[in-house]
Amino acid sequence: MCIRDRKKEINGVYLGADRYLIGVNDPEEYTEQMEDSRIASLKKLVNRWDAKVMLVPTADNILTDKLPAFAPHYDEMRLLAKVKESVGEEHYIDVYSALQEHAGEPIYYRTDHHWTSLGAYYGFLAWADNMGKFPYPYNTAGMKTVSEDFQGTLQSRINVAWTKDRIQYFPETEKKPVSVTYDFADTADSLYAPEYLETKNQYGFFLNDNHAFIEIHTGYNPGKTLFVIKDSYANSMIPLLAAHYETIYVVDLRYFNGKLFQLMEQYEPEQGMDVLVLYDCIHFLEDFKFY
């Protein structure tokens, strides 16, 4: 076990203030060449599909007051400025500002690298604002708690007794029946998988964890279709988007081995579809690649 007392770091995790565990994102690991390569691919997708882009900052860039003194972290604000300049302001969803405004609220888990349902809600509002949509009126005061003993990926890495997180969701997302198909085979009638709450991977509660391809049919907005290219940050926000679309297709490029544009053309309806790229900044750099 590597422990650096000055930075309060264990195995790539900062031991932050207020019991926050924050993943270490070393600035030296994310080169300008890597940034430019990912942004070039993103611009190609945006130009072809008129896509919207939401790259979510990780906790180290928003909860800076929780970081140990002098702890280095990758500057995602600089990356986001490059992305915005490349894809154009109309395609760029500024979730950074939305999260920064609510940094004093529990928008990230303390023991996991994801944002919470509250964080995803603020992302949803930023998306609606960019799209010119009146957002479905979810009630943050009415969020339902399904677990109070979640210990996420960062907790697993430090292997030290720490704190426990609460997992919540918006019960309004269950107001209408849905039909969900995972990986062209398995079907479900919910956007949630409560069986994951009995496992170590409790975040899998959202959208039944990660899958190469998900097809969602809702009782909302006939004729409206959304295609999402994403990492796991999207799993807790997609249920909030369901009230705005009849059909949502979701692809995770980490597990999908086919040709992305060919898949999108296959599922695009005659009237067209909205396209959303939704990643956290670090996984965008590490995983955003398609053929």
Per-region residue spans from a language model:
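Extracellular glycan-modifying ectodomains
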Residues: 1-291
